[in-house]
Amino acid sequence: RVALLNTVRPLCPDVPPDLLQDFFVRLDQEYFQRFTPPTIAEHVRLTAKLTPEHLCEVAFADQPDHRCVITIVAYDYFSEFAMICGLLSAFGLNIEEGDIYTFAEKTAPLSSRTSRNEYGPRVRPKATPGLAQKKIVDVFRVQPVPGVELGRKQQHQLADTLSSVITLLDKGQFEEA
């Protein structure tokens, strides 16, 4: 993965190094075999936009055959996948294919102390907000059912609705979601 990381790094120069490293360490090998470096960089940039106040990012890529690739990057919550699929269906989108990835649990960071003889408070490096939380990268290939449009207006509505649902999940309000 080091070679791939070195290929992706220049494609997302504004992403903090700890976030880029976390992305590469916590996603499994299958993810990195499935996507190209430019696509991985786009997913990294979407992940970099997540904060405890901004829980998800949605990107739409219109395809020439009236299909659309929808990428959802968010913090991971119980029942989230079912909610996403239900929401796509409620918007009249037939899910033809989905690539679903969840970050592995974060391992405990190494202590900043270098020996047992060192005293005083530990100095913690400034961490990216939300870095330790598990995240998802879900990529859906969808096609609107006959009579349904997925223009910019509908894309914006879908992203807003998804954000509202994920906010409810974050608050533990599963029934309301």
Report each predicted region and the residues it spans.
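Non-catalytic interaction/regulatory segments
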Residues: 1-177
